[in-house]
UniProtKB/Swiss-Prot annotation:
Biological function: Receptor tyrosine kinase which binds promiscuously membrane-bound ephrin family ligands residing on adjacent cells, leading to contact-dependent bidirectional signaling into neighboring cells. The signaling pathway downstream of the receptor is referred to as forward signaling while the signaling pathway downstream of the ephrin ligand is referred to as reverse signaling. Highly promiscuous for ephrin-A ligands it binds preferentially efna5. Upon activation by efna5 regulates cell-cell adhesion, cytoskeletal organization and cell migration.
Bilayer topology: Single-pass type I membrane protein
Residue ranges constituting the Eph LBD domain according to the UniProt record: 29-210
Domain SAM residue range list: 910-974
GO cellular component: a single term: early endosome
Domain named Protein kinase: residues: 626-887
Main location: membrane
Membrane topology, Cytoplasmic segments: 567-981
Protein name: Ephrin type-A receptor 3
Length: 981
């Protein structure tokens, strides 16, 4: 018993050290029995009475704890039992038994015979009864053995002296439970042991919220199988896919499947659904978060699933709830009518306000009016007689052709712009109207006289006339030869003498008038036969008179010339030197003076047979003379290759070859070859040269001279900063000379840009790209479509954008942009501004600033090219003269535009005293309220404005920012301050 007392004394010391840690259990463990937490005696039953003994000890908080000890090691045949009360299993099919104990090393007990043991047994018994049979009647067969427990560490007398206790922990599981509860029994066969703690628990998967689904506490299964658990959505959430998870045997959640989502009007926040606050909405459960109401809509209450449109704004039925509310467009602008007899072409510009939508369409309404003035004028719908091409309603482009109108009739056409919400607005539609009067044809042609090689015609103009007659067009051809060749002549007179005809040949003549409203129709035909040559002597007395006068006049002129040379050769030489060189080329032929010939561009569309235009202006090349070497690019119609051309009796040259891709239509073939028929009319060192075409075999080819350095924009970017100003001027001079030649031939390029200028090895620049189709759909610089393709907004003059009015003056505007591209080494005009912002900025007076290191005189020439009034822009001939003068006088290029601010202290900014005056000076007055609201009310405060602050103020256009910041630099120079902007 002495040993027992020693043990009972030492065991509490060990408990005090560890008890606090023993009471913290994981969340997934549910305790059914914990001996350390019992408030009083455990009341377990022991048998025999001298076996297991309940001992009460104090933990570090002076809370009593109950333990059981036994140490009957001196006597053999020990069989001491200890049994717990009924432990309710609470539905668990598997429970765990955790035993914490200390055990004395038998070898450390002096004088103990071989009866000492170092193990004990643990049993359990299932029962539905809370009262068990007395332990003295226990039969071991009634209990199921869990295990024999041995200590991993046992303590000795030395450990007792050193106050070192060794605590063992063993955990065993019991599965397959089915009854109400179970009893645990501990069997001692002669060990010295203390049960410090006995805990019975089961494992569960604790309550969890995952993917907005709540999964309840779930008891693990009776074996290692997973238990499938179905979750329920949290409040204000709904199932997207049935949420499920699996509870594992060790009490952990595995394999989440499915999820819940917050209902419309709610968003997920920290695992629950929170209502959208005012001003926000969530339209669909599939959306993750509440978002701010789209422009022109609002939500005044929480939980909004959609936002309501502001007054005057609407949302179409097909519009998503995330789309901004929109409104009907404003009226179209700038209507233009072009009358061609009984047909009218109507064009207009898109509405200034599209209503915020991209589905703008147009409808055209036609009324036929009586022509009376004032209130007595009566108009009625045109009815089905007028034909609209492509259609009358639902037009997607701002253009329509109206045909089959009645001649000499007043019409009113009203154009309205519509979009997807026009039908939702109660406001009346906004229209723009234009009045036109259909014109009448030229009256019948009259023959005045005819000769062997000429015919004189006369006619009367249209009456009444729609506008002023600009000119008349006379077309004639040999009878039965119309399909092969015909000639077009123009005159401002009501009569014309047609020369160069074949004697004794029958011709067909037709005449039509062109007024401000366009061309009229041809009025009838007149068939005339020229006289035979042998009829002149005895025939027309007029011819004899003309011949006699011609002979006499020639004789007199000859006498005068001889006298001039004899009397004063020097004086006549002086007179000749002052004479127009063109006058020397005059010749007398058949009694008439033949005037010098002026070349004029002939549009391929004037040919009824486009193939004839190709034959007239382009040389056919045998394909055997061409050798293709490599592909250098791809064009609109097919590949572009480099190769060699070898013509008979000529040296081999390098050429560029455009080929027409397979599967082309006849229309594509005509468009492809039309470029050749245009290029073939030009002969200038700064215009790309046509070598010829291949049309008699496939693929069809256009062969041009080869330009080694490719397009000018790419070439400049590749060689940024590597040329002198004089070299750049030489390039610009070549481009201007080529454009002067084109303008003198009455050819308008329409797409002059650095990308359409080619550069050869000698840095000679040549104008290219003369295609008729102007299909630029893949060009990122293009904007809205016209009859000739898309317009490259950044290079195009304002009148050409607004009214489709392309002239040599609009080419001059484009040339100014090319100048800017060249000096900036291929920088993109207007930088990253959108096309619409460019149109708006230019219309408000903004012009591109001088590129870096740009001479002042060059930037001024650019500004001259960008005059809003096209008549104020220089002609190409003037531009060439200006560039020649600058090249001859390099000193004029020294002053740089971007350094002029610092060199000249007297700037326009020096004369202003207020922010408002300053903004008006630089034509940025629309931003007065922006500056005032931001607190910039004095010029001193403006000195420190940066680009980021301009963004905050709402000055978003990049061009406007550059203009304001540039002027701020002038202000800083005047005030002696320099701030990084």
């Amino acid at each position: 018993m002495a040993l027992f007392r020693i043990y009972s004394f030492l065991a509490p010391f060990h408990i005090l050290v560890l008890c606090q840690a023993l009471r913290n259990y994981p969340d997934n463990e549910v305790t059914l029995l914990d001996s350390m937490s019992a408030p009083g005696d455990l009341g377990w039953e022991a048998y025999p009475s001298e076996g297991w003994e309940e001992i009460s000890v104090m933990d570090e908080r002076n809370i009593p704890m109950r333990t059981y000890q036994v140490c009957n090691v001196m006597e053999a045949n020990q069989n001491n039992w200890l049994r717990t009360g009924l432990i309710q299993r609470e539905g668990a099919q598997r429970v765990y038994v955790e035993i914490k104990f200390t055990l004395r090393d038998c070898n450390s007990l002096p004088g103990v015979p071989g009866t000492c043991k170092e193990t004990f047994n643990v049993y359990y018994h299932e029962s539905n009864n809370a009262v068990a049979a007395p332990l003295r009647h226990i039969r071991e067969s009634q209990y199921i053995k869990i295990d024999t427990i041995a200590a991993d560490e046992s303590f000795t007398q030395t450990d007792v002296g050193d106050r070192v206790m060794k605590l063992n922990t063993e955990v065993r599981d019991i599965s397959g439970l089915s009854k109400r509860g179970l009893y645990l029994a501990f069997q001692d066969l002669g060990a010295c042991i203390a049960l410090v703690s006995v805990r019975v628990f089961y494992k569960r998967c604790p309550l969890a919220v995952l993917n907005l689904a709540r999964f309840p506490d779930t008891v693990t299964g009776g074996d290692s199988a997973l238990v499938e658990v179905r979750g329920t959505c949290v409040e204000d959430a709904e199932e997207l896919e049935g949420p499920r998870m699996f509870c594992s045997a060790d009490g952990g959640w595995l394999v989440p499947i499915g999820r819940c989502v917050c209902r419309p009007g709610f968003e997920e926040v920290d695992g629950h659904c929170q209502p959208c606050r005012s001003g926000f909405y969530k339209a669909s459960a599939m959306d993750a978060y509440c978002v701010k109401c789209p422009p022109h809509s609002y939500s005044h209450q929480d939980k909004a699933s959609e936002c309501v449109c502001e007054r005057g704004f609407y949302r179409a039925e097909s519009d998503p709830r995330s789309m901004a509310c929109t409104r009907p467009p404003s009226a179209p602008g700038n209507p233009i009518s072009m009358v061609n007899e009984t047909a009218v072409t109507l064009e207009w510009s898109p509405p200034r306000d599209s209503g915020g939508r991209g589905d703008v369409s147009y409808s055209v309404h036609c009324r036929k009016c009586s022509g009376e003035t004032g209130a007595s004028e009566r108009c009625v719908p045109c009815g089905s007689g007028a034909h609209f091409n492509p259609r009358q309603f639902g037009l997607t482009h701002p253009r329509v052709l109206v045909t089959e109108l009645q001649p000499h009739t007043n019409y009113t056409f009203s154009v309205e712009a519509l979009n997807g919400v026009s039908d939702l607005s109660p406001s009346p539609r906004q229209l723009v109207s234009v009045n036109v009067t259909t014109s009448q044809t030229v009256s019948v042609i009259l023959k005045e006289r005819k000769g062997t090689d000429s015919v004189t015609l006369a006619w009367q103009g249209p009456e009444p006339v729609d506008g002023t007659v600009v000119e008349y067009e006379v077309t004639y051809y040999e009878k039965n030869q119309q399909d092969q060749n015909y000639t077009v002549l123009k005159t401002k007179s009501n009569s014309m003498t047609v020369d160069g005809l074949k004697p004794g040949t029958t011709y067909i003549f037709r005449v039509r008038a062109r007024t401000d409203g366009g061309y009229g129709n041809y009025k009838g035909e007149i068939e005339l036969e020229t006289s035979h040559e042998d009829m002149l002597a005895v025939g027309d007395p007029n011819q004899q008179t003309i011949l006699a006068i011609s002979v006499a006049g020639g004789a007199v002129l000859l006498v005068l010339l001889v006298a001039c040379f004899i009397v004063s050769g020097r004086r006549c030489g002086y007179i000749k030197a002052k004479q127009d060189p063109e006058e020397e080329k005059m010749q007398f032929q058949h009694g008439r003076v033949k005037l010098p010939e002026t070349r004029t561009y002939i549009h391929p569309h004037t040919y009824e047979d486009p193939n004839q235009a190709v034959r007239d202006f382009a040389k056919e090349i045998e394909v055997s003379n061409i050798r293709i070497e490599r592909v250098i690019g791809a064009g609109e119609f097919g590949e572009v290759c480099s190769g060699r051309l070898r013509l008979p009796s000529k040296r081999e040259i390098q050429v560029a070859i455009k080929s027409l891709k397979a599967g082309y239509s006849e229309h594509q073939r005509r468009d492809f070859l039309s470029e050749a028929s245009i290029m073939g009319q030009f002969d200038h060192p700064n215009i790309i040269r046509l070598e010829g075409v291949v049309t008699r075999c496939k693929p069809v080819m256009i062969v041009t001279e080869y330009m080694e350095n490719g397009s000018l924009d790419t070439f400049l970017k590749k060689h940024d900063g590597q040329f002198t100003v004089i070299q750049l001027l030489g390039m610009l001079r070549g481009i201007a000379a080529g454009m002067q030649y084109l303008s003198e031939m009455n050819y308008v390029h329409r797409d002059l840009a650095a990308r359409n200028i080619l550069v050869n090895r000698n840095l000679v620049c040549k104008v290219s790209d003369f295609g008729l189709s102007r299909v630029l759909e893949d060009d990122p610089e293009a904007a809205y479509t016209t009859r000739g393709g898309k317009i490259p907004i950044r290079w195009t003059a304002p009148e050409a954008i607004t009214y489709r009015k392309f002239t040599s003056a609009s080419d001059v505007w484009s040339y100014g942009i090319v100048m800017w591209e060249v000096i900036s080494y291929g920088e993109r005009p207007y930088w990253e501004m959108s096309n619409q912002d460019v149109i708006k900025a230019v219309d408000e007076g903004y012009r591109l600033p001088a590129p870096m290191d740009c001479p002042v005189v060059l930037h001024q020439l650019m500004l001259d090219c960008w005059e809003k009034n096209r008549s104020d822009r220089p002609k190409f001939g003037q531009i060439v003269n200006t560039l020649d003068r600058l090249i001859r006088n390099p000193s004029s290029l020294k002053q740089l535009a971007n350094s002029a601010v610092w060199e000249d202290p007297v700037t326009p900014e020096a004369a202003v005293n207020t922010v408002e005056d300053w903004l008006d000076l630089i034509k940025m007055g629309q931003y007065k309220e922006h500056f005032s609201s931001a607190g910039y009310v004095t010029l001193d405060s403006v000195l420190y404005v940066s680009s980021s602050e301009l963004d905050k103020m709402g000055v978003e256009l990049a061009g406007h920012q550059k203009k304001i910041l540039s002027s701020i630099q002038c202000l800083q120079a005047h005030h002696g301050t320099q701030v990084q902007v």
